[in-house]
Amino acid sequence: MEFLLGNPFSTPVGQCLEKATDGSLQSEDWTLNMEICDIINETEEGPKDAIRALKKRLNGNRNYREVMLALTVLETCVKNCGHRFHILVANRDFIDSVLVKIISPKNNPPTIVQDKVLALIQAWADAFRSSPDLTGVVHIYEELKRKGVEFPMADLDALSPIHTPQRSVPEVDPAATMPRSQSQQRTSAGSYSSPPPAPYSAPQAPALSVTGPITANSEQIARLRSELDVVRGNTKVMSEMLTEMVPGQEDSSDLELLQELNRTCRAMQQRIVELISRVSNEEVTEELLHVNDDLNNVFLRYERFERYRSGRSVQNASNGVLNEVTEDNLIDLGPGSPAVVSPMVGNTAPPSSLSSQLAGLDLGTESVSGTLSSLQQCNPRDGFDMFAQTRGNSLAEQRKTVTYEDPQAVGGLASALDNRKQSSEGIPVAQPSVMDDIEVWLRTDLKGDDLEEGVTSEEFDKFLEERAKAAEMVPDLPSPPMEAPAPASNPSGRKKPERSEDALFAL
């Protein structure tokens, strides 16, 4: 491939890159680094030639001093060059075949090199995540995280996206190095900035590690505070929404906005927690702690809101099911239960009492099938509602109000129950007059017998006959008043079955 395309270091940008990554340099040559950026931006083949030269310097190079210088040049070009160069750098092939290959276990690079490569991949993944044509590095970053690779803590520059500043100083004679060095210091990466006018005094290679504390300058502190203002604004909006919204009655659009704010604030909190342990400025650390406390408070309120909202939805669903089941099937056995007077009872026909259902049974049928057919005519729903309505009353109280408008129902088993009950209740009313008549009869009958000393068998038989005749002369007992008129006439042939039924219940 090199035979066809030529030596990558033979191009103008390749020559500058070879000089800027020479292992004999004591520090980064920012003049050459910025010249490389200018060539990439101004020439058509500059981005491709620069990528070829970087691959040549990075692949299989065991001189990690040159590797660190090449990574510095690569980072500077990404921050100062345009979209044409970004497409080539964020390509999955370049990230996987060059950068990931450097930190592979078989190469066993130093920790400083590993941290540098991982920091670049992480920063580019965050910066290019929203660009559809620059997501190759994002995929590599996600794959490495799934494999368990631990990335270093992000520095302050990760809070702002990578951008390409405009060229600040036109190209001048190389002899005039002072203005050019100042422009280079302004456009280079913040972590490599050096105080003027020391010629190109940049941090040495060991200082490139991103694991130490961060000493932010005034520009970085100002940018950080502007970012914290955004976080405070999001926190305030989220807090106001939680105050106004009622769990279970929120609007769908408001709920969606609240959930989006929660995700955004949680992502911001991760960065803030990372910076708290890294920033050495006490004032900035105090501000970060205050913002973190505000975020924690609003997160607690949001979690409480979500619990109430989910609990309210579950409660409404369960209440709907319970209401439906209670209306149809349940019977509350407590006093004053609404199930006793159910609104459904008024919509149906009055439930028949137990005695009226028994009246429908034909005791004259001798077959079991006839009895079963009589039972099947009864609606189980009516019996169920009747039980729900009359659970507080005894069977005897229910029989008081039973009336029979059908003469045929009198001959049933229910009529025997009712007649027996009514007869037992009616006897005490007429009992005093009957007993008086019997006592008068006994007194008149026994007046002449008080002086007799003995009674013969003939006289005793005669006495029994007279008593039997007197018993036949006793008038019938008056029947108690009934709510409905009794049948006009009852067949005399039914007296014996009624008496037999009375005897049956007496047993």
Swiss-Prot record:
Show the stretches that span the lipid bilayer. Answer: none
Q: Where is the VHS domain?
A: 20-152
Q: Where are the annotated segments for Disordered?
A: 162-210, 467-507
Q: How does it assemble?
A: Interacts with clathrin, SRC and TOLLIP. Interacts with MYO6.
Q: Which InterPro entries match?
A: ENTH_VHS, GAT_dom, GAT_sf, TOM1, TOM1L2_VHS_dom, VHS_dom
- The record's note on its domains: The GAT domain mediates interaction with TOLLIP.
- Tell me, what does this protein do in biology? Acts as a MYO6/Myosin VI adapter protein that targets myosin VI to endocytic structures. May also play a role in recruiting clathrin to endosomes. May regulate growth factor-induced mitogenic signaling.
> What is any one of the record's Gene Ontology cellular component terms?
endosome
Report what the protein is called: TOM1-like protein 2
Which residues in this protein are found as Phosphoserine?
S160
What stretch of residues is annotated with the motif Clathrin-binding? 329-334
A Pfam family this chain is assigned to = GAT
Q: Which CDD domains match?
A: GAT_TM1L2 (cd14238), VHS_Tom1L2 (cd16996)
Q: What top-level branch of life does the organism fall under?
A: Eukaryota
Q: Tell me what organism the protein belongs to.
A: Homo sapiens (Human)
All residue ranges annotated as the GAT domain in the record: 219-307
SMART domains reported in the protein's UniProt record? VHS (SM00288)
Q: In which tissues is it expressed?
A: Ubiquitously expressed with higher expression in heart and skeletal muscle.
For this chain, the family text in UniProt reads: Belongs to the TOM1 family.
Q: Does the keyword Phosphoprotein apply?
A: yes
